[in-house]
From Swiss-Prot:
Keywords: Cell membrane, Membrane, Transmembrane, Transmembrane helix, Transport. InterPro entries: ABC_thiamin-permease_prd (IPR017195). It is a multi-pass membrane protein. GO terms for cellular component: plasma membrane. Part of the ABC transporter complex YkoCDEF that could transport hydroxymethylpyrimidine (HMP) and/or thiamine. Could also transport other HMP-containing products. Probably responsible for the translocation of the substrate across the membrane. This is Putative HMP/thiamine permease protein YkoE. The gene is ykoE. Its main location: membrane. The complex is composed of two ATP-binding proteins (YkoD), two transmembrane proteins (YkoC and YkoE) and a solute-binding protein (YkoF). It is found in: Cell membrane. It comes from Bacillus subtilis (strain 168). The chain crosses the membrane at residues 9-29, 40-60, 63-83, 85-105, 114-134, 143-163. Signal peptide: none annotated. The keyword Cytoplasm does not apply.
Length: 199
């Protein structure tokens, strides 16, 4: 993180803290749903727990953004009283690594919507493998597991990838991300649009 700007670190930290609160709220909501419909009820909302990794990576576009943001969010969640306790930090690392692996595959150079959705799906796969070995998912039938995985993949793509991009773009339009990678990209797009309009 030596090449990171102070503004990048501050904004990433603030966003991670905000989403830590969101994560905790969804944890309680998910527990209610699971109590009513079983563990599969978590899957449609699972992608929300990956969103900060996509937002941070998309805004900053530097190695480690996806992973570090998830770790910060998990640490704050732990302090706020997540039912999983310190294990939520391990979960955050797993989820962050899943997203980071996708950006690594592009050498941190591609941040299109498909890549962001794949990052959400990467977290889905990583977290699902974790759940198989740690959360007792291995006890479920193969068919049930397949349905859970498919739903989680879709949730990761939509709630982390698509929604994460929408949130980031909205922040960029406010000007708060000026000087950061996404803010610079938006500035260039506006300049090109202005030049095109003047022709």
């Amino acid at each position: 993180m030596k090449s990171w700007k102070v503004k990048e670190i501050v904004i990433m930290s603030v966003i991670s803290i905000v989403f830590a609160v969101v994560y905790l709220l969804f944890t309680h909501f998910g527990n209610v749903l699971a109590g009513m419909f079983g563990p599969i009820a978590y899957e449609p909302i699972y992608g929300i727990w990956f969103i900060v990794s996509v937002i941070a990576a998309y805004m900053i576009r530097k190695p480690g953004a996806a992973l570090v943001s998830e770790i910060i969010a998990a640490l704050v969640e732990c302090l706020l009283g997540n039912p999983s306790g310190p294990m939520v930090i391990v979960i955050g690392i797993v989820q962050g690594l899943g997203a980071e692996a996708v950006f690594l595959a592009t050498r941190w150079k591609a941040y299109s919507l498909p890549v962001l959705m794949l990052a959400g799906m990467g977290s889905s796969v990583a977290s699902f493998i974790y759940d198989l070995f740690v959360s007792g998912y291995a006890a479920y039938s193969p068919g049930y597991l397949l349905i859970m995985l498919v739903i989680r993949l879709i949730s990761g793509a939509l709630l982390a990838g698509l929604l994460g991009k929408a949130v980031s773009d909205s922040l960029a339009y406010t000007g708060v991300l000026n000087g950061m990678a996404l803010g610079k990209e938006l500035k260039k797009k506006r300049k090109r649009a202005s030049e095109h309009a003047s022709l």
